[in-house]
Amino acid sequence: MQTLHVELGERRYPIFIGSQLDPKQLLEPYIHGQQVMIVSNVTVAPLYLSHYQEALESLGKTVATCILPDGEKYKDIQHLNLIFDALLEAGFNRDCTVLALGGGVIGDMAGFASACFQRGVYFVQVPTTLLSQVDSSVGGKTGINHPLGKNMLGAFQQPQVVLADMAQLNTLPERELSAGLAEVIKYALLGDEDFLVWLEENMDGLVARDADLLAEAVYRSCAHKARIVANDEKEQGERALLNLGHTFGHAIESYLGYGTWLHGEAVATGMVMAADLSQRLGWISNEDVARTKKIIQRANLPISCPQIPLDDFLGHMAHDKKVLNGQLRLVLLKQLGQAVITKDFDVELMKQAILANQHG
């Protein structure tokens, strides 16, 4: 087992990364109070809920559960309310803990619920997908979608602890595994070319679910994110770099309808668009773009999206949270392994990059 810490002063917390982790031993120091609400979904609960419920009950905790439907399209205010209903019906108090057992949607919703319930209760993350292990479970961003934009309602809510168990990735559908690899590739492209080389050498093993390689990929990804979050928790500056591919990707997700494409799939094509625009600006080479596309394809991810009318695409981009004073800011590549956030780009070139990476 490997341990990383997200350094946030007195709110410092550990990320435990390994296979067949013992929840009783690892969670005991971090569960405050006697009441624990496990939030999961209909896919994950039959696989792992009893394991965590029994571990917590053996610690003398009162455990209640809230099982939600599975999917991004349920990440809304109506389903968030089901968590509040469960907490209130169980009579839980402000000293309770909300434990997220699932992927990014469950983590986002359970975290947001924990930030709101009685103005804030304790929160624990047990991410069961690769994407949530390397991205959404680390750093405290929680929230839900609104019909007009993704993650428009939310709060920063740091967990007490994160448990990333590689054994749980064995039950992950192939498409979900690939979606997680998109975020892993993102860390390499935005800040670590050595990691990109490692991914190029080990992508076949990652796709084949080699537990040691997955643990190394999760560790390196989380270490990268933890460093950025420690420097910029509330995304005032450097943390925005973690949105490489996301402005384009969110537009794809929003237009197609949440859940039609997985988040990681949309981000993958978004990173291709960002690389394409970076090349059109003269920042990276054609070879760099080809290298970006190749590693994304090797992870069984899309490098183009269905045709989306340009006005619709741009309209969805305009709802992005990185819009500042009416100006769209994009995360682009100065070179592979070095990203920047900028508003200094030619909009016509951006349109070309969008259109060039769609298929009929």
Swiss-Prot record:
E.C. no: 4.2.3.4
Molecular function terms from GO: 3-dehydroquinate synthase activity; metal ion binding; nucleotide binding
Reactions mediated catalytically: 7-phospho-2-dehydro-3-deoxy-D-arabino-heptonate = 3-dehydroquinate + phosphate
Record keywords, A-Z: Amino-acid biosynthesis, Aromatic amino acid biosynthesis, Cobalt, Cytoplasm, Lyase, Metal-binding, NAD, Nucleotide-binding, Zinc
Annotated residues for binding of NAD(+): 70-75, 104-108, 128-129, 141, 150
Main localization (coarse): cytoplasm
GO CC term, one of those recorded: cytoplasm
InterPro entries: Dehydroquinate_synthase (IPR050071), DHQ_synth_AroB (IPR016037), DHQ_synth_fam (IPR030963), DHQS/DOIS_N (IPR030960), DHQS_C (IPR056179)
Cofactors, names only: Co(2+); Zn(2+); NAD(+)
Pathway assigned to this chain's UniProt record: Metabolic intermediate biosynthesis; chorismate biosynthesis; chorismate from D-erythrose 4-phosphate and phosphoenolpyruvate: step 2/7
GO biological process: amino acid biosynthetic process; aromatic amino acid family biosynthetic process; chorismate biosynthetic process
Cellular location(s): Cytoplasm
Pfam families: DHQ_synthase (PF01761), DHQS_C (PF24621)
Residues binding Zn(2+): 183, 246, 263
Function summary: Catalyzes the conversion of 3-deoxy-D-arabino-heptulosonate 7-phosphate (DAHP) to dehydroquinate (DHQ).
Full protein name: 3-dehydroquinate synthase
UniProt organism field: Acinetobacter baumannii (strain SDF)
The gene coding this protein: aroB
